Amino acid sequence: MNRRELGQKWEELAEQYLRKKGYKILTRNYQIRGGEIDIVAQDGEFLVFIEVRFRSDISFGTPSETVNEKKKASLKKAIKVYIHENFLYHLQPRVDFIGIEQKDNRFFVNHYQNVLDF
C-alpha cells in the first residue's frame, strides 16, 4: 500500500470509531489550497474537525507529537473556509485528534477532544 492508501485505511478506522460513539460523519478529506481536514463530523451542537495520525513505532514520537505548528495553521485555515462554504455558523467548532498506534498486531485508538483553540 502506498502512503495515501494507508492514510485512508486509518481514516476509515477512525470513522468507524466515531460512528460507534454517535458522531455523524459529514465529510472526509476536505481540501483547500494549503490545508486539509481528515474528517468533519457533528457531535450534538459541535461541528468537529478531526485530524487522524498513525504510528507503528512511537520511538520517533506518538501520533499527537506529529502535529506541528504549520499543520495547526493550515488546519485552522481549512476550518474557516469549510464553515463559510457550508454556512455552519450555528454549530460550535471543535478540533479533535485521533491517534492510532499499532502494538504487535493490535490497534489502539486514542481520541482527544478540543485540542486546538479556535
Curated annotation (Swiss-Prot):
**Pfam families recorded:** UPF0102
- The source's superkingdom equals Bacteria
Q: Which InterPro entries match?
A: Restrct_endonuc-II-like (IPR011335), tRNA_endonuc-like_dom_sf (IPR011856), UPF0102_YraN-like (IPR003509)
Task: Tell me its family.
Answer: Belongs to the UPF0102 family.
Name listed for the protein in its UniProt record: UPF0102 protein CHY_1414
Gene Ontology molecular function: nucleic acid binding
